């Protein structure tokens, strides 16, 4: 069945936004610091901010502007009518860049704490090597139960993130039918939305995760099918042409540093 911007056909009530984009934030200073720490074999990631306050890097700012330019270049009737963002600084900066590129005020961006990064608890700021050295029992537990179900002390599992995103999906279906919605979040947020919208199981989404990271400012796009009863994947991991040759942040969903 083809996709459509119409909210309903043949008297059937639509249940979804007409268009949905789920985007990872631009490269952050935490991404850079984590990659340096991992490559140097360090135990801890050197960050001056708490995770929620980590800003975009200079490259991340450029990526956010490029994403905004791409969105602003869409025909007006195809641009987002609603922008939702994680409360984390790097995501809000990315969302604001898009809003400004489209000539919208900063107030056009609505922040929602349910879109925040997965919380890593006691493992926050530790590198992979640091976790193995400092928390060997947790490292073994993660291997045993798998990343989908593993919850570090004080942190979240993928299931916990999915649980909070289910309520956002419900909001989209109740309050934003026929709208064009842009969501700016984090890598695990993108993957968990895919799990929900495409009705995946654990094995399927983890196989996708193993294929590689979601690019910074990478776009996963859905369109409502003709009757509005479901969403169809249009593309995933798409980056605006200006960003096509940029490096992708390495390490998939490691419990360390800012994602």
Give, region by region, the residue ranges found by the protein language model:
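Active-site-proximal alpha-helix that buttresses catalytic centers in soluble enzyme cores
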Residues: 2-104, 162
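Short, active-site-adjacent cap segments at secondary-structure transitions
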Residues: 29, 90-92, 117-118, 189-191
């Amino acid at each position: 069945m083809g996709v459509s911007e119409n909210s309903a056909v043949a008297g059937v009530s639509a249940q979804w936004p007409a268009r949905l984009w789920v985007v990872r934030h631009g490269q952050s200073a935490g991404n850079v610091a984590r990659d340096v720490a991992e490559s140097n074999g360090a135990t801890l990631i050197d960050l001056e901010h708490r995770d929620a306050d980590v800003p975009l890097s200079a490259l991340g700012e450029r990526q956010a502007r490029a994403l905004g330019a791409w969105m602003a270049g869409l025909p007006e009737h195809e641009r987002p009518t609603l922008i939702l963002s994680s409360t984390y600084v790097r995501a809000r900066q990315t969302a604001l860049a898009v809003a400004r590129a489209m000539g919208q005020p900063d107030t056009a961006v609505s922040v929602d704490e349910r879109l925040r990064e997965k919380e890593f608890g006691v493992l926050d700021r530790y590198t992979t090597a640091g976790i193995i050295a400092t928390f060997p029992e947790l490292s073994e537990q993660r291997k045993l139960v798998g990343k989908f179900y593993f919850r570090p002390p004080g942190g979240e599992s993928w299931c916990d993130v999915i649980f909070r995103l289910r309520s956002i999906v419900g909001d989209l279906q109740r309050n934003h039918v026929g709208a064009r919605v842009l969501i700016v979040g984090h890598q695990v947020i993108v993957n968990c939305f895919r799990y929900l919208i495409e009705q995946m199981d654990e094995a399927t989404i983890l196989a996708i995760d193993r294929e590689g990271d979601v690019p910074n400012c990478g776009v996963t796009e859905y369109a409502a099918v003709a009757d509005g009863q479901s969403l169809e994947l249009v593309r995933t991991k798409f980056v605006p042409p200006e960003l096509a040759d940029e490096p992708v942040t390495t390490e998939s969903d490691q419990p360390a540093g800012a994602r």
